Amino acid sequence: MKVIKTLSIINFFIFVTFNIKNGSKYSNTFINNAYNMSIRRSMANEGSNTKSVGANAPKADTIASGSQSSTNSASTSTTNNGESQTTTPTAADTPTATESNSRSPPITTTESNSRSPPITTTESNSRSPPITTTESNSRSPPITTTESNSRSPPITTTESSSSGNAPNKTDGKGEESEKQNELNESTEEGPKAPQEPQTAENENPAAPENKGTGQHGHMHGSRNNHPQNTSDSQKECTDGNKENCGAATSLLNNSSNIASINKFVVLISATLVLSFAIFI
């Protein structure tokens, strides 16, 4: 901005000096400059007004000479009329000076301050902020939350309910409600008794798997857990510790997220350096 302003000011003064010294010889070289077009118009208007004043001045002398010749040819009584004629052209030439002063001032100082400011301030501030905020915050959260919570619950439910609750879960909720309504119509107290040992059976098989005191419980736990104990996180999920389920997967996801965040930081820093180098 400072360089552009200084160059425009220097160009303005150079153009004024050439017009003062050489007239209109160098006027064709500054046609493309917008700042100098207004100055040319003002100088052209002033030059035309001064030429009109110079052209009208000798005409007044000719009118005065003509009036004197008419007075000399007519008689001595017409001298008063001749003098009145000599005074009238000087009064008629005076309005030309007023017209030359009324056109020049409002043209020179309008175009120089209206074009430069709106170009530099709009482009530098609009490109950098939307890159940093949108991409970095939209990719990291859905990776960690969805995968860790979606894999652990189906492992625990299928193993514990494989003994007695499998046929109840395969049927839909509407079929269970229809069966319960039919049983309630036939006997009100009958279905309550077999449901309680089923819940007890669901609670009892989890105990030998966790403790491992008897041989039968130990073998049963080893058969069920041998193909699934490939990592420590799945052991903790089968034991019932839901807090530690998916810990290894979350660590891997965090490492991938850290790598992606580092890439975004490098890209953002590169764009900022390029923007500063271009605009500064």
From Swiss-Prot:
Residues 99-149 have a biased composition (Polar residues). May play a role in the merozoite attachment to the erythrocyte. Its main location: membrane. Residues 51-74 are annotated as: 5 X 12 AA tandem repeats of P-P-I-T-T-T-E-S-N-S-R-S. Sequence repeats lie at residues 105-116, 117-128, 129-140, 141-152, 153-160. The lineage of its organism: Eukaryota, Sar, Alveolata, Apicomplexa, Aconoidasida. Residues 255-280 form a propeptide. A lipid is attached at N254 (GPI-anchor amidated asparagine). Disulfide bonds join C237-C245. Residues 170-182, 233-242 have a biased composition (Basic and acidic residues). This is Merozoite surface protein 2. GO terms for biological process: cell adhesion. It comes from Plasmodium falciparum (isolate K1 / Thailand). It is a lipid-anchor; GPI-anchor. Glycans are attached at N22, N36, N168, N184, N229, N253, N254. The N-terminal region appears to be involved in lipid binding. Residues 64-98, 150-163 have a biased composition (Low complexity). It comes from the Eukaryota. Residues 1-20 form the signal peptide. The keyword Acyltransferase does not apply. Residues 44-206 are annotated as: Polymorphic region. It is found in: Cell membrane. The keyword Repeat applies. One of its GO terms (cellular component) is plasma membrane. Keywords: Cell membrane, Disulfide bond, Glycoprotein, GPI-anchor, Lipoprotein, Malaria, Membrane, Merozoite, Repeat, Signal. Residues 47-242 are annotated as: Disordered.
